[in-house]
Regions:
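Homeobox/homeodomain signature
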Residues: 12, 20, 79-81, 133, ...
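A subset of signal/propeptide-processing and intrinsically disordered low-complexity segments
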Residues: 27, 118, 139, 157-160
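Flexible, surface-exposed loop regions and adjacent strand-edge segments
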Residues: 40-51, 56, 131-137, 169-181
Length: 200
């Protein structure tokens, strides 16, 4: 049976021209998501290990589940895998969004100085479908900045991404053939650079 999800929430986008030179904004999403039905979700590595410790199971075994992970059986009563029921479990984050500010100031000879800063943030969330606690990612914030000078046909800019060098992951996975081992896909750390753009 395919999982069924229920999601409701609220999104807010705001922009304020604070002064002639300064503009600020915010974008925030509040979500309340859960599995309406997910009886065949995969078990975590720990759950699978606990179930395996019960020995060979049949449909007549006195105990056929461990830690929320239940054995599945074929028509002949022998075991055919395992799964957990995640009905009602949370999906996604409680909130996420961004805050930003843009500042510009005219200079001599038609030049324009600009500076922008932004912060992206999120609540914690599970990175794997089995909701393994070891694959839970805590909430975090990332800050970016750019500043430069713009003319009619050229722009020179300095920029920094993730300037506080926040360590985050974009996903996680169980390592095959290494029971209980986990890996993570990590995102970029702090990045600094310069950019020159010229329009012909």
């Amino acid at each position: 049976m395919q999982p069924r999800q229920m999601l409701k929430g609220l999104e807010i986008d705001m922009t304020w021209q604070a002064t002639d030179n300064l503009r600020v904004g915010a974008s925030v999403a509040f979500t309340d998501g859960s599995y309406g039905s997910f009886p065949g979700a995969g078990c975590t590595a720990q759950q699978a290990s606990d179930l395996l410790a019960l020995g060979v199971l049949t449909v007549d075994s006195p105990v056929t589940s461990a830690g929320g992970c239940s054995a599945k059986f074929k028509g002949d009563g022998t075991q055919a895998g395992a799964g957990q029921d995640l009905a009602g479990a949370q999906v996604g984050t409680d909130y996420n969004g961004s805050l930003w500010a843009d500042y510009t100031r005219p200079l001599a000879s038609g030049l324009l100085w600009f500076t922008s800063v932004d912060m992206n943030f999120t609540d914690g969330y599970f990175m794997t479908g089995d909701r393994d606690p070891i694959d839970y990612h805590n909430g975090f914030e990332k800050f970016n900045i750019r500043t430069g000078v713009r003319a009619e046909n050229w722009t020179v800019m300095l920029y920094g991404k993730n300037i506080t060098d926040e360590e985050t992951a974009t996903g996680a996975y169980d390592i095959p053939l290494a029971a209980g081992s986990h890996g993570r896909y990590t995102s970029e750390g702090s990045v600094w650079g310069a950019r020159l753009t010229y329009s012909f």
